[in-house]
Amino acid sequence: MSETKRVRVRYAPSPTGFLHIGNARTALFNYLFARHNDGDFIIRIEDTDAKRNIADGEESQMTNLKWLGMDWDEGVDVPGKYGPYRQSERQSIYEPLIQQLLDEGLAYKCYCTEEELDAEREKQKANGEMPRYSGKCRHLTKEQQAEKEAQGFKPSIRFKVPANETITFNDMVKDDVSFESNGIGDFVIAKKDGIPTYNFAVAVDDHLMEISHVLRGDDHISNTPKQILIYNAFGWEPPIFGHMTLIVNESRRKLSKRDGSIIQFIEQYRDLGYLPEALFNFIAMLGWSPEGEEEIFSKEEFIKMFDPKRLSKSPALFDNVKLTWVNNQYVKKLPLNDVVELSLPHLQKAGVVSAELDQAELDWVHKLVSLYHEQMSYGAEIVPLSEMFFADAESITFDEEETAVLAEETVPTVISAFKKELEALEVLEAAEVKAAIKRVQKETGVKGKGLFMPIRIVTTGEMHGPELPLAIEVLGREKVLNRLDTWLKNN
């Protein structure tokens, strides 16, 4: 294909589920490639398998792509001259092309039943052979075909794969790739109901939409020789193909949608309060890397840098720890108001703040979130991070290490003195709390960890956390005094 041809790429999902991290990566790399080359990014919906399509599947794809920060030049919602952009609306385009292959003797009608095909495959497996269609309907006469149809058999249409050919293409990721035609077998291009199969519809659509490059996961690489054969049959020039390595989990196994231990759908990350810019950044580095060690880039920087030559030949590791780190880098840069907006729905969902906040409660939420602004990785994390602010004094328990600290003989004296200091304060602000702790130090003679750690553990229930005076201010006078009093009564 001529290198000067306008770059036109597509993301072509099936509306059979929600936007998966792997599909999002395919869309993102195509988007970056198009924008880097001032080309066109097209969304095409491959919805011919009606039984597998789900309600809202198409909407989920589009909504979440937009949320991630992608836009497109043509698609079901952006009309263009190459439409329709749903395969289910292109049947009138496919039918004459299928008939053309039949008329030219490049395809034929197959009357085999599923039972016959299953039996054929099982026999081949038992003989240690690669399962592929035997071609037994390939040489049926017109009379034999008519007899089959008179008996009520509906044919599928199979492509005649030429014998003894090597199908070779230069892949953007894998370099030269070859397949032997003898290992493919005549494949179905139209089902018994006349609906074209994936490989036929994709090849036709990519040609008619003038797709210049096909960048997709390498689970599609076995489809490529079939699509090239279809291109050749029509005398069309194939696009340039690129097959990205798959995404694997920490066990180096292919990321499976059935693995519930890993969050894999974009909608789930949205619901947890991840930032679209951070997910964009993380996904863009799944199997692609720029020069240098930097890992945080804007969308504009990714567009400027993107080069498919830097796509990895090794599987991309999905590292959830890395994702939360990336998201934290973005959260830290947000203004506090934005972090509050990110956190508030999760606090409300947990029932720890009101559904309708007055100004005083909203101000308090700002103080709470400010304690965790630097630490927070995503919106929903505010709930477990801040749970000690909502616990009742009676429900606070101490682990072995905390219990050991509180067993020191000076602790009751420190806690009593601190309680007395707080009771004398009219306003519980961080500066006043800090001064009160200093007075306790002077009064008791206890300092350092022996002073701060018992106060922290009794008031917050934790050995580590936000700066202690600030945490006590946010906890509030009543709650802190209640916790101090409860501990003293029980000890």
Curated annotation (Swiss-Prot):
Motif, 'HIGH' region: chain positions: 13-23
Record has Kinase as a keyword: no
Keyword Aminoacyl-tRNA synthetase: yes
Annotated EC: 6.1.1.17
Gene Ontology BP term (one): glutamyl-tRNA aminoacylation
GO cellular component term of the entry, any: cytosol
Chain sites annotated for binding Zn(2+): 110, 112, 137, 139
Cofactor note: Binds 1 zinc ion per subunit.
Main location: cytoplasm
Highest rank taxon of the organism: Bacteria
Annotated binding of ATP, by residue: 257
Needed cofactors: Zn(2+)
Keywords carried by this UniProt record: Aminoacyl-tRNA synthetase, ATP-binding, Cytoplasm, Ligase, Metal-binding, Nucleotide-binding, Protein biosynthesis, Zinc
PANTHER family membership: GLUTAMATE--TRNA LIGASE, GLUTAMATE--TRNA LIGASE, MITOCHONDRIAL-RELATED
Entry similarity comment: Belongs to the class-I aminoacyl-tRNA synthetase family. Glutamate--tRNA ligase type 1 subfamily.
NCBIfam families with a match to the protein in the record: gltX_bact (TIGR00464)
Function text: Catalyzes the attachment of glutamate to tRNA(Glu) in a two-step reaction: glutamate is first activated by ATP to form Glu-AMP and then transferred to the acceptor end of tRNA(Glu).
Subunit structure of this chain's protein: Monomer.
Name of the protein described by the UniProt record: Glutamate--tRNA ligase
Organism of this sequence: Listeria monocytogenes serotype 4b (strain F2365)
Organism lineage string: Bacteria, Bacillati, Bacillota, Bacilli, Bacillales
